[in-house]
């Protein structure tokens, strides 16, 4: 198992991680982090586009309230909407305890 601090598969010029994964025959990734609707979702979509099966442990992701004009969208709603958009299309979104049980 390898942990990567920054996951940038979406930039064509940064292929070191992609090469590392492909050379080792890795087919499944677990992606988590901050800004569920930004960094996490971008990484998930890029990984799925490259053919990886992706798992997102939803309690291992987080975000913040977002503001647009006079509207504030609570972090919980932003988080849930991003997870709903990813689940079943680009990733399998699971509870962290489910993922841990599957990895044992």
Positions of predicted regions on the chain:
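Active-site-adjacent betaalpha module
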Residues: 1-104
